[in-house]
Amino acid sequence: MKADYITRESLLPPYLAYPRFLLGMNVRLIAREVYIILLDMAYSGTDVRIDSHGRRYLTFYNKTIAEIIDRTPSTVAQTLRELEDAGLIEKKLISRSAPYHVYVKLPDGEDV
């Protein structure tokens, strides 16, 4: 990768938002990475749905996230459990043949 200096004319490349509250959370780095990707998907992704309460949720297979972060689907499953235990996501099983509905949550008082 070729790198260049930042100047006044430099534009910010595509990026993912890293919420400050994650800095103080006791979760692994990969969990933070997956949460950031899910948060980005929840705000700008094509797999976003809205439930009857007006809450956004994602529908995806672990393989989708695994390909983004270059890890295995089982690593993603473990990471999603960690995020759920931390209260940052909520998973709802709709049926065995469909992907989970994953709600990405923000701590009370936090906005993106």
Predicted regions and their residues:
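Short recognition helix of helix-turn-helix/winged-helix DNA-binding domains
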Residues: 1-63
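Short, amphipathic alpha-helical interaction segments positioned at domain boundaries
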Residues: 108-112
